[in-house]
Amino acid sequence: MILYHGSTMEVSQPRILKSEIGRDFGFAFYTTDIQAQAERWARRRAMIESRRTKTEIQAIVSVYEWDDSAAKHLQFLQFDGVSMEWLELVVTCRSRTDYSHGYDIVEGKIANDNVGETVSYVMQGIMRKEDAIERLRFEKINNQIAFCTETALRTLYFQNSYICGSVNP
């Protein structure tokens, strides 16, 4: 299976960054099987970095081959859609930096800006989880695959990278 990672640099050797707090499935290396989504991620990161550094920044997508058959030998959690279990994991991972779910790989929907707003309402106690699930059923939500352990990263093979855009300050 081909996977993509959007960034501002080529990522030939993926790593799990412990500095990225508040991610949907906790500390992990995040990919997607949707090329256009990875390109949006890359352009968004380039825009943020360009504003911060006041320099031109390239948006780069790294491409990987994933040996998904190896997932059979790993702790693999897959969500087919929005569910109570998915929401509870996202809320827990976003609100508790010390939380470790124990999975090598987690695949599921990504909490984009609209979804993130709903998740934050749940985290703040403004919205019940049941109401959030109902609201999220109508959202078009993209996919993400999070590689949460070094063992999981060894099933990911870098193929190439390409520039999908450039952002000026």
Whereabouts are the PLM-identified features?
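Glycine-rich loop/turn
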Residues: M1-F29, Q37-M47
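Alpha-helical interaction segments
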Residues: R15, S19, T31, K54-T55, ...
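Conserved NAD+-utilizing ADP-ribose enzyme module
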Residues: R23-D24, R40, R44-P169
